[in-house]
């Protein structure tokens, strides 16, 4: 009789079933000025018209509700907090929650839309509510961690922020630069250019170079997608250029984008990075986004615990307070060192990628000439 073992080899299947049953929380934030296609991006990503074309125009009250799609949890369907709308003089914020079920695997998706960034006459401090919202979610997670078993925690932390930039080949606004810089310190950030069909090929390249230059000069750290080797030649790093469709429920025409001069088919536009970006985020990098969010959360948690200890009267002696300040100073120095090293790695990576493109182009030309 052949030895069948004790069943250890079946543990991956048990883990898989457990993971499918528990599901995963995925929280995405879109940020930018009005009219750049943030809602259209989310609608096309989730495959249905779940968000209105402009959800910020007519909020009926403090809670602005949209119909949920694929909602399977009664708590979320009936809970008024599952739809939240906030408006102030600087920006508008809408939070919507959905359930997506695919092949018996459930994903709890929370979409946070931030609109109106840079649209005001005075935009000073418009990034503060965004930073506060991200940190409030960290604080909520920390409070739950103190009270509950970690597996029972509802994760509201933002896993990825897509920052929508205007399709302008010559300029990136100071408000966008400052907002991206503040967000990148506490959250995974990917800059994208909305409505990029307004740009010609040469303008698109100018826009890309300008944004890359700004990100480098301002030391804005962006999330680097894991890209397959065969895709690295044809795909570059962020910013990504997006053309989203007008998604309508029940529309069988392919959800194309209609213009006065005709119809455009986004899936046939070679320069449209939408499909590549969504596939990279969801299918290939979702778990890594959650893991890197843990790093941002641990940094926040360390600061909060340190401040809470230091603020208690009589909790620390003079030596302890001095030591705490030294540790905090060392952490800041280490963070600056990490940013500098990361920047050097980015520069080296760009250099080798340019060499790869040069060699590939040279090889292709030689092959053409020889034939």
Swiss-Prot record:
<feature type="region of interest" description="G1 motif">
    <location>
        <begin position="32"/>
        <end position="39"/>
    </location>
</feature>
<dbReference type="Pfam" id="PF00735">
    <property type="entry name" value="Septin"/>
</dbReference>
<dbReference type="GO" id="GO:0005525">
    <property type="term" value="F:GTP binding"/>
</dbReference>
<feature type="binding site">
    <location>
        <begin position="195"/>
        <end position="203"/>
    </location>
    <ligand>
        <name>GTP</name>
    </ligand>
</feature>
<dbReference type="GO" id="GO:0051301">
    <property type="term" value="P:cell division"/>
</dbReference>
<feature type="domain" description="Septin-type G">
    <location>
        <begin position="22"/>
        <end position="307"/>
    </location>
</feature>
<feature type="region of interest" description="G3 motif">
    <location>
        <begin position="113"/>
        <end position="116"/>
    </location>
</feature>
<dbReference type="InterPro" id="IPR016491">
    <property type="entry name" value="Septin"/>
</dbReference>
<comment type="function">
    <text>Septins are GTPases involved in cytokinesis. The septins localize to the site of cleavage and act as a structural scaffold that recruits different components involved in diverse processes at specific stages during the cell cycle. Septins are also involved in cell morphogenesis, chitin deposition, cell cycle regulation, cell compartmentalization and spore wall formation.</text>
</comment>
<comment type="similarity">
    <text>Belongs to the TRAFAC class TrmE-Era-EngA-EngB-Septin-like GTPase superfamily. Septin GTPase family.</text>
</comment>
<feature type="binding site">
    <location>
        <position position="257"/>
    </location>
    <ligand>
        <name>GTP</name>
    </ligand>
</feature>
<feature type="binding site">
    <location>
        <position position="116"/>
    </location>
    <ligand>
        <name>GTP</name>
    </ligand>
</feature>
<keyword id="KW-0547">Nucleotide-binding</keyword>
<dbReference type="GO" id="GO:0032156">
    <property type="term" value="C:septin cytoskeleton"/>
</dbReference>
<dbReference type="GO" id="GO:0005938">
    <property type="term" value="C:cell cortex"/>
</dbReference>
<keyword id="KW-0342">GTP-binding</keyword>
<keyword id="KW-0132">Cell division</keyword>
<comment type="subunit">
    <text>Component of the septin complex.</text>
</comment>
<dbReference type="InterPro" id="IPR030379">
    <property type="entry name" value="G_SEPTIN_dom"/>
</dbReference>
<dbReference type="InterPro" id="IPR027417">
    <property type="entry name" value="P-loop_NTPase"/>
</dbReference>
<protein>
    <recommendedName>
        <fullName>Cell division control protein 3</fullName>
    </recommendedName>
</protein>
<keyword id="KW-0131">Cell cycle</keyword>
<feature type="binding site">
    <location>
        <begin position="32"/>
        <end position="39"/>
    </location>
    <ligand>
        <name>GTP</name>
    </ligand>
</feature>
<feature type="region of interest" description="G4 motif">
    <location>
        <begin position="194"/>
        <end position="197"/>
    </location>
</feature>
